């Protein structure tokens, strides 16, 4: 997910400020916003990466909001625009499929595809046209990136046009809202016509998932999490197992939670990840 050479900034944000606007012209800037005498948020501009890093309580989000590769070197790109990683209590919950090979073939094609990342796919297309072993053709373009922080949490949102080649020219809007209690991800696909919209959540190795009735229960070393999905059209919620990189030249299996919607655009879906309450502790109270 994190590849060098992206033409955007990494912003490191913690909760508490009203609005954060990093200075894109600065280099190595560390900006501190203060509220009522206390440090409210810190924004750190690092080397260009196209990533936003947000932290709230024990939740840690890394969102891919930059171009897939430099315009001068369309290579080593993955079709992963608006993919994200999530850790809770420093334990991976949502992970990246990773890279296990540079050899041409189905494994390399899958690991670079939109379907291999925690983002939205439209009509089985990739958000960036990846071909060969390294190259990229038509690329997703991100616009409208905004980051807001407040007393309750952090919101990051943007839109990309990586599916503009499809009939109806779909646009993918994504908003992450992170608090110390939960992560809410709102996806909106606008455009014209009937399309298949698929949202995938790539779970970390060792994480189990059960799905039924539009909800899912995810169990990881960090605990149990409920996943609820609300959408503007009927959702088919399924789980599957797919190979992910365990190292260069090796793979292992991990679970994927998939939300599939077939409907006329616009399509809106909201996915909420929250920690399950300790039922036994409640019974003792």
Residue ranges and their predicted role:
Residues 1-2, 19, 32, 100-285:
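CBM-like, beta-strand-rich accessory domains located in the C-terminal region of large
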Residues 67, 99-100:
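A generic structural motif
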Residues 1-94, 150, 262:
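Carbohydrate-active enzyme catalytic cores, enriched for enzymes
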Residues 89, 97, 122:
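Short glycine-rich loop/turn motifs that provide flexible caps or phosphate-binding loops at active sites
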């Amino acid at each position: 997910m994190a590849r060098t050479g992206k033409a955007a900034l990494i912003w490191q944000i913690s909760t508490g400020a009203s609005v954060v606007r990093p200075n894109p012209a600065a280099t190595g800037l560390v900006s501190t916003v203060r509220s009522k005498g206390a440090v409210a948020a810190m924004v750190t501009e690092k080397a260009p990466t196209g990533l936003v890093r947000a932290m709230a309580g024990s939740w840690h989000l890394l969102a891919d909001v930059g171009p897939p590769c430099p315009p001068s070197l369309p290579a080593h790109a993955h079709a992963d625009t608006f993919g994200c990683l999530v850790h809770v209590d420093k334990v991976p919950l949502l992970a990246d499929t990773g890279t296990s090979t540079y050899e041409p073939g189905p494994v390399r094609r899958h690991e670079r595809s939109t379907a291999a990342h925690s983002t939205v796919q439209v009509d089985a297309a990739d958000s960036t046209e990846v071909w060969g072993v390294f190259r990229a053709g038509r690329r997703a373009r991100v616009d409208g990136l905004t980051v807001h922080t407040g007393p309750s949490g952090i919101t990051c949102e943007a839109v990309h046009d990586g599916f503009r080649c499809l009939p109806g020219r779909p646009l993918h809007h994504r908003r992450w809202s992170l608090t110390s209690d939960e992560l809410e991800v709102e996806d909106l696909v606008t455009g014209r016509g009937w399309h298949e919209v698929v949202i995938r959540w790539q779970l970390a190795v060792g994480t189990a998932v059960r799905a039924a009735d539009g909800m899912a229960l995810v169990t990881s070393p960090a605990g149990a999490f409920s996943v609820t999905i609300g959408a503007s059209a009927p959702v088919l919620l399924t789980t599957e197992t797919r190979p992910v990189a365990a190292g260069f030249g090796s793979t292992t299996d991990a679970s994927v939670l998939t939300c599939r919607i077939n409907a006329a655009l616009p399509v809106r879906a909201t996915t909420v990840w929250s920690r399950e309450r300790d039922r036994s502790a409640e019974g003792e109270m």
